[in-house]
């Protein structure tokens, strides 16, 4: 009979006490995980998290208290755990896991790595570091009632990046400024307006009508002419929005009536700005034209205003007059905050700062009204503006428990028993909330864990700069941290160097300036990640508007056409206003893979052939997943399009 130490066999208990574990993230899942680890018998734990504790964390991250607000999550989590398990050996790092100090050798110090992260970039990085160090990684995520845990092992399972994930949703500037069609467009505009008035000004966050919008011009020459007209007509003196606001003493009524600050006789925010947009009549051939607002008319509404909805104040939708008054009150409060900070001070928008949140709520709803959209409650605006998806403490607790169970299998040398486990919102037809699935084998075409990672990128070599190649393609798209790029031209030309000062002069040059053309090959190396990627360049002058590059086949999955995932992804973003989930966070969504199945255990998806495409649905990464984009089994009833189907990884 096996000797037991508590509920565990002695051999396994000894393994727990001697093994070193790295926990990446000390938030919702991380707090539960640290507690579970020490209570299970793990002694040597290192935890890293760059974040500090926020008031909004306290309802579910139980290791933190109000007195800890503003302090390091990792450090406070360590101190809290040691209070009920002083024998544990815990090291805390208040730092980013992407810091070069945490290199492959650092990862090789551990027998297990456990992710409790909330963003894709860090997940990608840890995935690559564990592959390079050949250390098992237990990946996890939650969103509302949904959750998942999976195990990643080099050469035996899919890595985190084996399956393609939809890119983060962004919006063209002309859509935000000229033709908003969804509430999120108005919310983004309102956040831009906050920065233009009270924060750090950014030329990319302009809120006035985009006179150079190509769609508004009858021919391309008109767009160019409009773009320069305001600088050429007469002695117009251009002033910034903030300068004009200061000159008025941040008068709320004047701010309501004026925003674009194209001149000292600037257009009005909800009236003349809109009147100007109406002169760009080509925009409204197939769209409903906006309806200008005027402060005096709104104040005449009086008792006609109604509040929509009942219950908590934040969940009520006010009328136009209510939001106009909220706009006035928030501006007065923000003006006082600026005055207290002194000359030259700036405010930073924070979803947890009531006046800042009130301002964005009011301004965005007034703009929604102008463009004939259903207005939103403060709760809904906050959900979208702050990319917030409600987190549930019990879901985090369940997922953290599953992480430890998978860890025990690995330490007990039972890797073949490891599973990807999904926590569903409702029981499946077999009345199961927790559904285990066999781990998938590596994807042979994965651009991360394949034996020779390779991708093909379509771009315009005459318009793509080296800086864009580095930042948008290699870092943002392919998750590199510090890439070095060499052109395979027989001479070994260095295009990008991670060493500071070596190739900065190349940044503002076009790829064609270095002889890169259709068919050129680039070798990109990230020595921190011990990762090499071969990039095949396809030159194209026919990319869609606002698209700088395309990954052919949407690597690593080369089967679907590029337009297919785009169509699915845009279902929700193109919804009519009335069809949108009340807490939908459509601004910036990231995605994580989750399988919704209806059997006690499913085989590896790689053995399902065509059926797999109907069985898989995407369980989105952060803080944000779109219910309407999820693929369901053909024989399955449609799931409710519910708020909690939005995915945030906590």
UniProtKB/Swiss-Prot annotation:
Compositional bias segments (type: Acidic residues): 590-603, 638-650
Location in chain, cross-link Glycyl lysine isopeptide (Lys-Gly) (interchain with G-Cter in SUMO1): 237
GO biological process, one term: regulation of cartilage development
Binding site for Zn(2+): 159, 162, 446, 449
Record keyword Cytoplasm present: yes
Active site: 174
Top-tier EC class: transferase
Keywords of the record: ATP-binding, Cytoplasm, Isopeptide bond, Metal-binding, Nucleotide-binding, Nucleus, Phosphoprotein, Transferase, Ubl conjugation, Ubl conjugation pathway, Zinc
Pathway info: Protein modification; protein sumoylation
Name of the protein described by the UniProt record: SUMO-activating enzyme subunit 2
